[in-house]
Amino acid sequence: MNPLIIKLGGVLLDSEEALERLFTALVNYRESHQRPLVIVHGGGCVVDELMKGLNLPVKKKDGLRVTPADQIGIITGALAGTANKTLLAWAKKHHIASVGLFLGDGDSVNVTQLDEALGHVGLAQPGSPKLINMLLENGFLPVVSSIGVTDDGQLMNVNADQAATALAATLGADLILLSDVSGILDGKGQRIAEMTASKAEQLIDQGIITDGMIVKVNAALDAARALGRPVDIASWRHAEQLPALFNGTPIGTRILA
């Protein structure tokens, strides 16, 4: 069975209750299914806390974090360090054998600079599946942070939705984007069960989909097109539904190519 990538986002990394629910769902799923799982994560809340503690400004452009050269080390420490190891600690607590990685390990995802105006922000492209496939074949849960590296050795902060998309293309995997919201909401706050590119463009034009959700929807649309299969956006809050979601039952918004 093809692997499943679960991209973690929102305040999940900041909530012990959310992490407990997630890892309990992962344990339950792994006990009854053979499907290999991969976690990809960002950690914006971890970065924001660190930046605030250091009195550094947080600047975003089109939903993407501007990352100056003097901040990439801090952001790498927060994402590939604190956020990644926090997830590994929760996996250990739940007796799941896991391995912490960043996008550059084994050239799993290739990264180039996205835009000079954004600084050390990377564009992710599919890379080599060898390392992660080897880990999956041996029963490990790879936990991959959204820090990448260019061919000339520059560390890059990559939007985690886009990183997960590139890794899904690398592995031929299905993709779920887990966030704080139960999916994409319409103008009345109701969940939209299915979303096409034309519907997304309409809601963006109407100002209903804004900011970071635009990045998330576009990443999901890109993923659906690249993978040739639907991509799910859903919430981690409904833990009892997560095993069904991991098995292909939509509980949030299903993005169609």
Curated annotation (Swiss-Prot):
GO biological process: arginine biosynthetic process via ornithine; L-arginine biosynthetic process
Keywords: Amino-acid biosynthesis, Arginine biosynthesis, ATP-binding, Cytoplasm, Kinase, Nucleotide-binding, Transferase
GO CC annotations, alphabetized: cytoplasm
Positions bound to substrate: G43, G44, R65, N157
CDD domains in alphabetical order: AAK_NAGK-NC
GO molecular function, one term: ATP binding
Site note Transition state stabilizer, residues: K7, K216
Reactions listed under catalytic activity: N-acetyl-L-glutamate + ATP = N-acetyl-L-glutamyl 5-phosphate + ADP
Protein location: Cytoplasm
EC number: 2.7.2.8
Residues binding ATP, per UniProt: D180, V181, S182, G183, I184, L185, I208, I209, T210
Pathway(s) where this gene product acts: Amino-acid biosynthesis; L-arginine biosynthesis; N(2)-acetyl-L-ornithine from L-glutamate: step 2/4
Function: Catalyzes the ATP-dependent phosphorylation of N-acetyl-L-glutamate.
Classification via NCBIfam families: argB (TIGR00761)
UniProt similarity note: Belongs to the acetylglutamate kinase family. ArgB subfamily.
Quaternary context: Homodimer.
Listed name of the protein: Acetylglutamate kinase
Gene that encodes the chain: argB
